[in-house]
Amino acid sequence: MLVTLLETFSVVFQVANGDGNCVPRFQDDVEFCDNYILEAVTEASKMIAPRAREQKLCCGFNKFTHCVTTASKKCSEAADRVKRVLDTKMTSLGVHCPDTNKVCNGGVNTSVSANTVTVYLLFSLGYFFYMNKL
């Protein structure tokens, strides 16, 4: 799993920053999008029922995915490439969120792994370390 996380992080950075300055153009938006994940993780940690926790994480992740994909459109075709790469890599993690479109308030219906919350948190952390070195 660690190899998949590191590989995903590397590929997303290469794809998103393909023109040399894509990531800085939507950095603030990505920081805003992180709030969806952080809120979901905080709320899920207070829940007792495993299914309710999973639904909360899936809804937060779906909102985050939609937010990041929208933000990356500032980099022209990077949004499609980022989404394709993430979908491919994340699908390989196995456990998929159920159709949360019915249970999420305005949630975006995507097929993603519940474990990808961890991937995105690591991606965000690595992203901020990367940006602080520039």
From Swiss-Prot:
GO MF annotations in UniProt: toxin activity
Signal sequence segment: 1-18
Organism of derivation: Chilobrachys guangxiensis
Compartment(s) of residence: Secreted
Propeptide segment residues: 19-56
Claim: Cell wall biogenesis/degradation is one of the keywords in the record: no
Keyword terms: Secreted, Signal, Toxin
Organism placement in taxonomy: Eukaryota, Metazoa, Ecdysozoa, Arthropoda, Chelicerata
Role, per record: Probable secreted venom toxin.
Protein name as annotated: U35-theraphotoxin-Cg1a
Annotated Gene Ontology cellular component terms: extracellular region
Tissue: Expressed by the venom gland.
